[in-house]
Curated annotation (Swiss-Prot):
Cofactors, names only: Mg(2+); Mn(2+)
Binding site for ATP 2: R708, K747, L749, E753, G778, V779, H780, S781, Q821, E833
Co-factor binding comment: Binds 4 Mg(2+) or Mn(2+) ions per subunit.
Organism phylogeny: Bacteria, Bacillati, Bacillota, Clostridia, Lachnospirales
Domain ATP-grasp: start-end pairs: 133-327, 672-862
GO BP field: 'de novo' UMP biosynthetic process; glutamine metabolic process; L-arginine biosynthetic process
Organism the protein comes from: Agathobacter rectalis (strain ATCC 33656 / DSM 3377 / JCM 17463 / KCTC 5835 / VPI 0990) (Eubacterium rectale)
Binding-site list for Mg(2+) 2: E298, N300
Residues noted as binding Mg(2+) 1 in the record, renumbered to the chain: Q284, E298
Protein name according to UniProt: Carbamoyl phosphate synthase large chain
Summary of subunit composition and partner proteins: Composed of two chains; the small (or glutamine) chain promotes the hydrolysis of glutamine to ammonia, which is used by the large (or ammonia) chain to synthesize carbamoyl phosphate. Tetramer of heterodimers (alpha,beta)4.
Intrachain disulfide bonds: none
Binding site for Mn(2+) 1: Q284, E298
Region ranges (Carboxyphosphate synthetic domain): 1-401
Binding site for ATP 1: R129, R169, G175, G176, R208, I210, E215, G241, V242, H243, Q284, E298
Amino acid sequence: MPRNNDIKKVLVIGSGPIVIGQAAEFDYAGTQACRSLKEEGIEVCLVNSNPATIMTDKQIADQVYIEPLTLESLKEIIIKEKPDSILPTLGGQAGLNLGMELAECGFLDEQGVKLIGTTAETIFKAEDRQAFKDTMEKIGEPIAASQVVKNIEDGIAFTNKIGYPVVLRPAFTLGGSGGGIAHDEQELIDILSNGLRLSRVGEVLVERCIAGWKEIEYEVMRDANGNCITVCNMENIDPVGVHTGDSIVVAPSQTLGDKEYQMLRTSALNIINELQITGGCNVQYALNPDSFEYCVIEVNPRVSRSSALASKATGYPIAKVTAKIALGYHLDEIKNAITQKTYASFEPMLDYCVVKIPRLPFDKFLTAKRTLTTQMKATGEVMSICNNFEGALMKAIRSLEQHVDSLMSYDFTGLTDDELEKQLAVVDDRRIWVIAEALRRGVKYEHIHEITKIDLWFIDKIAILVEMENRLKTEELTVDLLKEAKRIEFPDNVISQLTDIDEADIKKMRYDNGIVAAYKMVDTCAAEFEAETPYYYSVFGSENEAAETNPQKKVLVLGSGPIRIGQGVEFDYCSVHCTWSFAKEGWETIIVNNNPETVSTDFDIADKLYFEPLTAEDVESIVNIEKPDGAVVQFGGQTAIKLTEALMKMGVKILGTKAEDVDAAEDRELFDEILQKTGIPRAAGGTVFTAEEAKKVANEIGYPVLVRPSYVLGGQGMKIAWNDDEIEEFIGIINTITQDHPILVDKYLMGKEIEVDAICDGTDILIPGIMEHIERTGVHSGDSISVYPAHTISEKAKETLVEYTKRLAQALHVVGMINIQFIDMDDNIYVIEVNPRSSRTVPYISKVTGIPIVDLAARIIMGETIKGMGYTPGLAPTADYIAIKMPVFSFEKLRGAEISLGPEMKSTGECLGIDKTFNGALYKAFEGAGVELPKYKQMIMTVKDADKPEAVGVAKRFEKLGYKIYATRSTAKYLQEHGVNALRVNKISQESPNVMDLILGHKIDLVIDTPTQGNGDKTRDGFLIRRNAIETGVYCITAMDTANALAHALETASDKKTPVDIATVKNL
């Protein structure tokens, strides 16, 4: 059936800020779908509050709204734009829930707008726990014994009937939010009360725990005609009980017999037909490893994290096809974009193995619980492809960029046999390393399987890797042994460690004997048809399929790897824009990246895509085959920057700013020389390697000092130290990972923090806009609320900023991007740090100023000038509206993590508020970040002594807004003495009713708690207050500047005269 011609204008709902459970995969899906709709001549409107995405670029849709994803703002956009249809299945859980709410409240019928791609009834049947249960029972699909409960008493009664442990799954939530496994009544009460609060409809499913069964997923497609195909089936290495987003996943499944595979495939198609789903859908199963018994765990009636993985694993563009099906096309009418010969009704075939490993944030949150359950904790993931499972696992491990490159990287040799056995039972992110250690000690496969419930097939494969370690350690390195080690992807540096042979000699031995990587293509059809836009993966001991092309010029663009705190989707945005710019100028583009969730790894972004780890050895193999004319490293974050030196050694030209100038910005002594030459002041400080040296520097310049390693992103390992003991502690933590570069110790200055992104052509600079942070220095720039245009700095300070930016860019010979952070102390400007590369603020500042910085920087790298491109050098004219970028955190998913803000970054995402007034923009930014206020108008204040004078002003503003203020002893006394009617409440250690009772009583909206120094202690009152506030869903602020900003925003909300102004990116 050709497409439905009644559909002319579609509103696509994006997924909002990146949080744990909802990452870059929706930017990828949304971008692909918008492009797919525009191909069909549809007018596309898009709403998304996340400015870091490609989907919010003006060329992706006809109208782009960066507005909070709330019912109110969507209604306004629908009234203004009058779309005939809404596509809600590409915006993750956020998009689905909004589509549902718009349909339920009758607004869509009123406006004559219909949901396409799915119906409200389908969403309800799949997402509502009771409706889903009834539907499965109706078609005879087995589910675990369960009951939907709306209160705690019913939950306890049902659990007593079926016995512990039980799994709790809230309805309509994302990434397992609020869910978990309860082993006893206390755990049940804790998890259930949280789950009922987080569910949109106040429902939680309590079900029999089938942890230990295999977890299998099927990604299926269906059109309106009832044609169905399975795109891919996947198997979690971890058994049921770990969220699939936190599991190691392999595609296609490796341990299913044909009977099991066909049984689950039939079931998946049965379910998708009953639910009448049109488009992509994901079905998760639990399979009893000892029989043919299975249960349906859940169905996602939308594009999901798993569908991004399935798309990249097979080359089948699920989001693109879903968008076409939503327009009425059938599968056999949609061409396969990779082969251009087959159709979307053709099931993909894989002649390789794909492994996905989650990227978990425990390197950022040293106090957080490492255990993995049904509530997701990963911020991102990596994917690798190989022709054998062991090789794919080894490649995925080194793609994580967590200082791991083999199964020896986490060291469990110090454990006794009993301790090791206990560790095997712990489900955390290091489990395969523990299994490897058990195998080294001769523990039997069956015994490991009994404890971990991981299939024997996977244990056997880990044993093959352990056996190879042993052979490399004990045997002579022959050509045959080296061939076999490379076949299962042992990197040269690991072979070198095990054999005690120099890495350079191993490489020479490989080259002399022709042991080099060959590249195979992903073509969806196991090489049955010719592929037009393939992508490649490396294997050893096979024929090379990467086509020899000799165009005029080739550029290698290094991607940014997995999404993690500190290096998010912003850098993918920069990589993609850079690639598009080079392609426009006739260069052949080559991307290397390993993140399945991103736009950069889509099959049609670059001319060639290599799905490989971003390490020197892996990149060198590609360079040897492609021989690029140059490489661009300034857009891939720290990942790409770290490979600069290796690329130069390979003889690859670095395009843009030269490597030695990048080093000069990171190297303390060289940078100090540049500052002296250019006459720019900075904080006093020095470089050290040991705690003794650090204490000496700190005492010379005076406490407090900022301690940080060099060459890091997102303030990794950065701390503010107030005394000698803290220096000892912090240097100890930094030095747990061997440092190749010195540690920096600087005087900590208090002032306004200002950030500038600029481009330089070697002579002139262009600054699109100056951004000012609401939080004072000491809070990482990625965690601060950022305001454009800067609104409290003087003209004189602005002139100084522009002048200093120009001097620094010229002294560092910048060609392309530069990012500088300054401090403004009473019009005296100091430089904090300089990064001659793109930064996380680039997408945001590009959008709000309308200056496409990445494109301009790429053109400069190719030889154009700022004037030649038609721009006036210096600071661009400022806008007549305010744009505020608000950080978004995922603390509630990370039990035990310290939430107070400091110099190490903790936010996972961001959203944007745009308005004519400062307060209006602030209100939208808080709304976009999901801050729901006020409900009860009751708050708790407990602030450190230094903040008390400022707390009085804040408290008075909240009092005026009608808030009842509770405060702990000394804060209450101080507030009362200064005319605030604060109610004193006991500390946690004192008798009830105390602070904890108030928080756990669910009657508090807001906690303002500014921590004292030495915030590492988990038993202190402050830590417990902050943690419990977050875990019961209370908004918690840890800096006075943020509290002031929130008061501003709420004053706007209460003053209803200001209409919400809806602006599109086009008009900015």
